[in-house]
Regions:
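Conserved beta-strand termini and adjacent loop/short-helix elements that scaffold enzyme active sites
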Residues: 61-63, 85-88, 144-145, 173-176, ...
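Short, well-ordered coil/turn elements that cap or connect secondary structure elements
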Residues: 5, 53, 77-79, 135-137, ...
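Conserved beta-strand scaffold positions in the cores of enzyme catalytic domains, especially
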Residues: 29, 84-85, 140-142, 214-217, ...
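Well-ordered alpha-helical segments embedded in enzymatic catalytic cores
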Residues: 38-42, 97-101, 171-172
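Conserved beta-loop-beta/alpha segment of the NTase-like Rossmann-fold superfamily
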Residues: 67-163
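Catalytic-core segments of class I nucleotidyltransferases/pyrophosphorylases
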Residues: 111, 125-129, 133, 162-233
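N-terminal glycine-rich phosphate-binding loop and ensuing alpha1 helix
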Residues: 2-69
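Active-site glycine-centered loops adjacent to acidic/histidine catalytic or metal-binding residues
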Residues: 16, 116, 228
Length: 233
């Protein structure tokens, strides 16, 4: 683990109450297999990023009801430099507020990774490494999965992606659209360049113009959203 300035900062927002998940424990710690819980699957790409040789700082945004999650993350101290910050109650009580809380602690490129999203498909664990290297020229790159289920897209960051391949770009983007027709994908992770990172909270604003339009896209086969149990892709 490096204590020097990071090449990439990963924001991990863990302050939510998991109302839709409906369990009496933190959804991040829901068991998927012996010794593996949801947040472990969510962090696979982050660990791969650190093992690629880049210096990675993980900024975990939490509240006191998530101290069990904080304790679980101690097992990642060997691979990741971690900073824990209590979500600022003076900010909006949502994803945007969590991002704003974390931003003063970020350096370098900034990635947003959600603790209830797990990538699936061959090579998906390398997708964040690829996305970090593809933020230019727009200053943005998304890890995304194509999916056409309207119910899924209404609960996610919906995208319209252009042609498949290494040159895929975001043509349109909207957070949890009421009318998802015209969208064919959703993002699982977002990476911003240092000059664009201050705009990260905007991706969580419903009905607002999204800074993700024009972003590069790294495609994965799919991802599981453990908050709503829907899987695009």
């Amino acid at each position: 683990m490096s204590t020097s300035s990071p090449d990439v900062t990963v924001i991990l927002p863990c302050a939510g109450y998991g109302v839709r998940f409906g369990a009496p424990y933190s959804k991040e710690l829901h068991s998927l297999a012996p010794g593996v819980c949801v947040i472990d699957r969510s962090l696979e790409a982050v660990v791969e990023l650190a093992r690629s040789g880049l210096r990675v700082r993980l900024v975990v945004v939490f509240r006191t009801h998530k101290l069990d999650v904080v304790g679980h993350l101690a097992s990642y101290a060997r691979d990741l430099s971690m900073v824990f910050v209590y979500q600022d109650d003076s900010l909006e009580d949502n994803l945007g507020g969590a991002i704003r809380t974390a931003l003063p602690l970020t350096e370098g490129r900034v990635a947003l990774v959600l603790p209830d999203i797990a990538l699936v498909g061959p090579g998906s664990e390398r997708s964040l490494v690829e996305a970090v290297g593809r933020t230019e020229p727009s200053g943005w790159c998304v890890v995304a999965s194509r999916g056409h289920d309207p119910d899924a897209l209404r609960e996610l960051g919906a995208l319209r992606l252009g042609a498949r391949g290494t040159g895929a770009r975001v043509l349109a983007a909207e957070e949890k659209p009421l009318r998802p027709d015209g969208f064919n994908a959703a993002w699982a992770m977002v990476v911003a360049s240092p000059r664009q990172a201050h705009r990260l909270p905007e991706i969580a604003l419903k009905g607002a113009d999204s800074p993700l339009v024009g972003a590069s896209a790294v495609e994965v086969a799919g991802f599981v959203n453990f908050n709503t149990a829907v899987t695009p892709g």
